[in-house]
Amino acid sequence: MGNCVGRQRRERPAAPGHPRKRAGRNEPLKKERLKWKSDYPMTDGQLRSKRDEFWDTAPAFEGRKEIWDALKAAAYAAEANDHELAQAILDGASITLPHGTLCECYDELGNRYQLPIYCLSPPVNLLLEHTEEESLEPPEPTPSVRREFPLKVRLSTGKDVRLNASLPDTVGQLKRQLHSQEGIEPSWQRWFFSGKLLTDRTRLQETKIQKDFVIQVIINQPPPPQD
């Protein structure tokens, strides 16, 4: 389990104005998934709510917003088993891990950042919310008036983009729209919402996204061919 504590109480960062000196060592991010058990069985929706609460409020306590954004993107990538991308995000933001986990991190100024374990992996006693429809093909939307709304997506480059979306749209369709607007190939895009990787066949209405919510898009562009 590394140095994370398998409990739900959130560890807040150190008090503002008193950054802790970071450890002298920096270990690469470990690939094994941290295991923990919740004090009570929780659903996927409850886990998302806890994560949203943490990510929405953590930057208000201490630390730099760009570091919190990088840690959030790295946590999403690691949970999706894209450890190479997660490590690249950490290295790009000059974040060090004295124990090789995201439970305790330091920026280049020596500020300490602590992530609760529930932001890094689901509990072993997570309650799965299955329905009969999940095993079937996604139903085609019935012909009706398309009700569009502006969907805000935040790229891992830090840029915010607004797409014209409707609830029946699939993530695959929105990836192609982002490609037409920003030139980012759909195969380079990984979409996350509330810590969950969204597949191309996922419809927006299935994510329970609400107005003013933001979808994270991690861009994993392949390196250019060498001469």
Swiss-Prot record:
Record-linked Gene3D superfamilies: Phosphatidylinositol 3-kinase Catalytic Subunit, Chain A, domain 1, Ub domain-containing protein, DC-UbP/UBTD2, N-terminal domain
Pfam families on file: UBD, ubiquitin
UniProt biased composition (Basic and acidic residues): 24-38
Signal peptide (residue range): none
CDD domains in the cross-refs: Ubl_UBTD1
Chain ranges of the Ubiquitin-like domain: 149-224
Residue span of region Disordered: 1-42
Primary role: May be involved in the regulation of cellular senescence through a positive feedback loop with TP53. Is a TP53 downstream target gene that increases the stability of TP53 protein by promoting the ubiquitination and degradation of MDM2.
Subunit text: Interacts with UBTD1.
PANTHER family in the record: UBIQUITIN DOMAIN CONTAINING 1 PROTEIN-RELATED (PTHR13609)
Protein name (record): Ubiquitin domain-containing protein 1
Organism: Mus musculus (Mouse)
Biological classification of the source: Eukaryota, Metazoa, Chordata, Craniata, Vertebrata
Gene name of the record: Ubtd1
